Design a protein with these regions (language model features):
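Generic structural signal for short, solvent-exposed loop/turn connectors between secondary structure elements
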Residues: 1, 16-17, 47-52
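Terminal low-complexity, poorly structured segments
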Residues: 1-2, 59
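N-terminal acidic leader/helix
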Residues: 2-32
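Generic serine detector
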Residues: 18, 42-43, 59
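Acidic, low-complexity, intrinsically disordered interaction modules
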Residues: 24-55
C-alpha cells in the first residue's frame, strides 16, 4: 500500500506562480480524506517526476505512474 497516493492527477500553475496538484487521494496517512476523494494540494515545494514524489509544506504525496501516449 502506497501512502498518500494521487491517481488521475494534474498539475496546475496559478497566475502568481504557485503550483498545485489535483487528483484522487488514496491511503491518506492523516486520515483527512476517504479513498478516491478529489483533492487539491497546497502550494508545491518540490516535484520529482522520476521518483513520482510531490512535497508541500506539510505533506508528501506519491504520484501514480501514468502511461504516455505517443503518436
Amino acid at each position: 500500500m502506497i501512502p498518500n497516493l494521487l491517481k488521475n492527477w494534474t498539475i496546475e500553475r496559478y497566475w502568481n506562480g504557485s503550483v498545485v496538484v489535483r487528483g484522487e487521494i488514496y491511503n491518506d496517512t492523516k486520515n483527512r480524506f476517504p479513498d478516491g476523494t478529489n483533492i487539491r494540494t497546497s502550494s508545491v515545494q518540490y516535484i520529482d517526476f522520476v521518483a513520482g514524489v510531490v512535497r508541500t509544506l506539510n505533506s508528501i504525496y506519491h504520484l501514480e505512474e501514468r502511461e504516455v501516449y505517443r503518436k
